Amino acid sequence: MQYNRLGKSGLQVSALSLGSWLTFGKQISDEVAEELMIKAYDNGVNFFDNAEIYARGQSEIVMGKILKKLGWDRTSFLVSSKVFFGDGRRLPNQTGLSRKHIFEACDAALKRLQVDYLDLFFCHRPDKNTPIEETVWAMNHLIQQGKVLYWGTSEWSAQEIMEAHMVARDLRLIGPTMEQPQYNMFHRDKVEVEYSQIFKTVGLGTTIWSPLASGVLTDKYLDGFPKDTRLGMEGLEWLKDNALTESRIEKARSLNGLAKELGTKLPQLALAWCLKNPDVSTVILGASKVHHLEENLKALEVVDKITPEVAQQIEVILDNKPVAPPF
């Protein structure tokens, strides 16, 4: 396993990590969740990602029980939560980034995950109804209390992230260390263009999600739409409509052919492509089966196969390279 610094922090995070969105407490059994965590940990994965909204808190409960049962050395792994969407309840102050909800969400996550502190705590979305100063102060306070080690953002704009940093600098507080954006072969603009200056200035770490574009960059959908897949789950029609377009399927088929020429598989090529980006700190894997995780962990062996020539072949297939504005 390769380990990278998380932004400019001293924290070392495995290049591949394990996420729990749509799987833990929902799509898979607790037994499979445990098998996935063991397989990941035994292969050097040290970061396990979660959030208050995942399965309305049940995902964190499942992960917490597993962590308690396995009894891993707490210094050997990182665990995260995210605050904004709440755990499914919708009364005032049960969502958002107010000081009240941030504090209560952190305490609830610690209880569900059965840990004394969160290594990473993300603001899951920006909150237009809360002053950024209040959010930065709240996160800084949690760090001072020892409940959180590093805080960050998820799906924030570059402007919002920089505003948080400016507030933190002016008030002599701790700013966000990392951002969790979607990043894959079909979703590139934010990481490759919008954040480009932030990488150079404040040194943003990234924990990217959906590296396989919700499964489109696997062989699942190359010849049709099997019903027993993630995109076939009830309530995820919006995800299916956004992810499964004919254009993407055609590109996936071409990429699959290239992967075969390189002696690898499409998911491994897609993951290796993400890993090749030096601004990516860790790639979050989602898996519902242990053998899928085993295959995806092999992506590290494919990175060196993406030579400049292969990278250009990929660009020709994708035909979507983001262009920075001329200013």
Language model: regions and residue ranges:
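Acidic-and-aromatic substrate-binding clefts and catalytic sites of carbohydrate-active enzymes
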Residues: 25-28, 51-60, 127-131, 158-159, ...
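Conserved beta-strand positions
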Residues: 18, 50, 81, 120-123, ...
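Structural motif corresponding to the early beta-alpha repeats
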Residues: 70-97
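N-terminal binding-site loop/beta-alpha segment at the start of enzyme catalytic domains
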Residues: 1-77, 116, 144
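Active-site mouth loops of central-metabolism enzymes
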Residues: 20-31, 89-103, 124, 129
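Active-site groove signature of glycoside hydrolases
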Residues: 110-131
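Beta/alpha (TIM)-barrel catalytic core signal, keyed to glycine-rich beta->alpha loops juxtaposed to Asp/Glu
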Residues: 132-318, 326
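Short, acidic/polar
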Residues: 28-40, 96-113, 161-166
